[in-house]
Amino acid sequence: MKKTAIYFFTLLLLFVSACKSEKVPNVSNAQVYTRVTFNRETTSATTRINQYFSDKYRKGAFNGVVLFAEKGNIVFEKAFGYSDFRKKTPLTTNSVFQLASVSKQFTAFAVMLLKERGKLSYSDSVRKFFPNFPYENITIRQLLTHASGLPNYMYFANDYWPDKHKLMDNRDMFSMLQNNRPEPYFRPGLRYFYSNTGYAVLASIVEKVSGMPFYKFMETQIFKPLGMENTFVYNPQNPLPMNVAEGHNPNRAPVGFNYQNGVVGDKNVYSTVEDLLRWDYALYKAQLVGQECLTEAFTPAFKNLRDDHNYGFGWRINEKDNIVYHGGWWDGYRSYIVRSLGDQRTIIVLINTAQHVPFHLPDLEELF
């Protein structure tokens, strides 16, 4: 994975059908899977990785938590810097971060789970669940693969949301779409265009189909069954846990209130590096959904995209090198996960500053 997985990790930093499986456990008897067995043996990779990130930290160019793993075993794990710069609270490997767009893979997985349960089909139209949805012929599959053409709520909300001191949520986003009908970017299915709106719509579909708030569905159907004890979807009615790292601006001041923080599905999953490793492990073991379903999620959806820029269900894909990956940034946080499916090597980096991250291919090639 030295030159392939690291390449796509660097790329992220620079640019930021039936499924078959065993029966999915119900909420009442959900199995908590055995935690990943961690192996912290000192290796030459440990020394290289530690020196690299330590140098970046000393130069003020990195503040976050890093985890490198192989087949579920930790090769390197370390926290660098502060959770809160004002209070000088140190980060730990148990610090919780906003995952930003890395959240999309969890939203996609929720849809996959409901599909396996026979509750929906990827070919279903959004209007099947929301008859008054103002755009025709948009399917769940198109939402999953960013082919819907929906306008970006992060832009049109600036025009239509009247009180920027009040939090908006998914229902408010739907109301703005319905009342104002902002122009779509293209007709559904025409091409790929990354869509935060599409994944927020998917979260609302999960709520509609399951009869549960999105945060509760994710907690009871995914996070708890997989033993992800420090992972949750943001709910403004619940205070954030004490171990949530503060998001910071480039000048290391805390990021203030953002009225769009109430929208979920495209962002707003919070997690730790070790919980993300449990997630990684669950995907390799095809827990909760079957391997056929995961294979479809990791299959490129577009024939005309460059291989390293293709997309599946919540994951960017490099089919040639058998790598899936995603990055995210939002309100003082950056997040990155790279999974080499062949040799089961995984890189997870969570950052709580919005500054440019100076990672370059020549520096990273030999780390892992």
Each PLM stretch: what is its role?
Residues K2-T10:
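Sec-dependent signal peptide recognition
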Residues F15-A18:
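C-terminal motif of bacterial Sec signal peptides marking the signal peptidase cleavage site
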Residues K20-Q31:
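Bacterial Sec signal peptide processing site at the extreme N-terminus
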Residues S21-E22, R40-T43, A354-F368:
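Short, gly/Ser/Thr-rich active-site loops of penicillin-recognizing serine hydrolases
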Residues F38-F97, K119-S123, R181:
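Short, conserved catalytic-motif segment at the N-terminal edge
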Residues Y57-V65, R86-L143, F186-S195, V264-K267, ...:
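Short active-site loop at a secondary-structure junction
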Residues Y336-T353:
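Short, well-ordered beta-strand elements
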